[in-house]
Amino acid sequence: MTDTTGRIPLWMIGTLAGILVISLIGIFFYGSYSGLGSSL
């Protein structure tokens, strides 16, 4: 990657990835706590 101008900033990708991971973990633990995660 020579230049990131005009492309998605790396910090934005990291932020979105972090939010996605936290959301997936939160949903997984919430499902497990609710008893719905047993099917996973």
UniProtKB/Swiss-Prot annotation:
Record-linked InterPro entries: PSII_PsbJ (IPR002682), PSII_PsbJ_sf (IPR037267)
Keywords: Membrane, Photosynthesis, Photosystem II, Plastid, Reaction center, Transmembrane, Transmembrane helix
Coiled coil: none
Annotated Gene Ontology cellular component terms: photosystem II reaction center; plastid membrane; thylakoid membrane
Database matches in Gene3D superfamilies: 6.10.250.2070
One matching Pfam family: PsbJ
Paired cysteines (S-S): none
Transmembrane segment boundaries: 8-28
Subcellular location: Plastid membrane
GO biological process: photosynthesis
Topology term for the membrane: Single-pass membrane protein
Annotated family: Belongs to the PsbJ family.
Subunit structure: PSII is composed of 1 copy each of membrane proteins PsbA, PsbB, PsbC, PsbD, PsbE, PsbF, PsbH, PsbI, PsbJ, PsbK, PsbL, PsbM, PsbT, PsbX, PsbY, PsbZ, Psb30/Ycf12, at least 3 peripheral proteins of the oxygen-evolving complex and a large number of cofactors. It forms dimeric complexes.
Function: One of the components of the core complex of photosystem II (PSII). PSII is a light-driven water:plastoquinone oxidoreductase that uses light energy to abstract electrons from H(2)O, generating O(2) and a proton gradient subsequently used for ATP formation. It consists of a core antenna complex that captures photons, and an electron transfer chain that converts photonic excitation into a charge separation.
Name by which UniProt lists this protein: Photosystem II reaction center protein J
